[in-house]
């Protein structure tokens, strides 16, 4: 092996298990955050009920936000690992794109913290104000006014604009980074066409169905530790790009094999 190729394979082997563990930990933390949040917030309707529940379970709200922040932030590890592996096998990739791969999860982690603080601040203001105290006595008659007051409390939270900035920037960076890494990993043969295409699709829809991307990350973690049937694609062991044959190339290869068998 060339020194650069040997170094690449050594780095990938050394970090495969730690990155896989970080990936699994990320998924568990995000799921735990969802569970904690669902237990803390009741099934009441409207933003007024939401803020009352949050104020009554402030510790759970803060815990959920921190769990989500750590979980989302850890997704930078598998994305960076995949990006670096593909970059080592392709001269077409732009190294500067690694910034989006790292910034996306980290900005979304900051968003989780800021959103949690924003909601806690709004809940405190809402519950301590005169309007919700009046509407709470006649909730059937004043629920609309209570929800309006709760909406105002959320929109007037001082950290809300900053959270929006990190949210938009993080979602765009995560979307582009996951698409870019999955695309080139598929082109270099590190991911099968199915999982590469799925990574691209889930990356494109991550701002709507973020939780579904966790299924793809679980697969990638299992791939890194070799717990999948068939093992890793050949490109992982060779250190070189081994693109998957197109349907036309595959059909041509099958025809050639058939002709050779007939001649024999």
Regions found by a protein language model. Give the residues of each.
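Hydrophobic, aromatic-enriched alpha-helical segments typical of multi-pass transmembrane helices
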Residues: 1-264
